Amino acid sequence: LGVPYPELKHRFERLEEALQIAEQMWSDDEGPFTGKHYQLAETINIPGTVQKPRPPILIGGGGEKKTLRLVAQYADACNLFATDIDTVAHKIDVLKRHCDELGRDFSTIKITMQGGQLKPLDDPDGFLRTVEQYAKLGVSLIGLAPGVAPDPVAYVRGLEPLMPRLAAIGQNAIG
């Protein structure tokens, strides 16, 4: 496209600096920010945030060395990119280790995931069993998308009968 695309290492460095800038903007510290990639004379956020102490930060991904460490250090939520129970369980364990290393309470991080591989209308009972397994791991939200559904309205209506059971799974997971 004609726009330089930095290598992965530099993109993660920039992301971390952007998170540091956001944290500083949302605090009482309006002083300068001097990073490797960004330098700001002031970090002012006017008007201030409505959510206190700051808006929640969600970081998506599953990279074990960088992404999940950034989640442990800066985020309130993690959207895992994983496709099966074992992988999600492993990523959560890695995130817990990062939290331990940083002195972060893992329970303060909301775990979400993309469920594009799940096909709730093909096998509703299997889908519900799978969701229950994810809930037991601590996943509190699974994003579903119909993909290239010929009739998205029919897809959503097909999910309607599953809602009471999904609600029960959610209640059991949190209560």
Where are these regions (language model features)?
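Active-site-adjacent structural elements that line small-molecule/cofactor binding pockets in enzymes
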Residues: 1-175
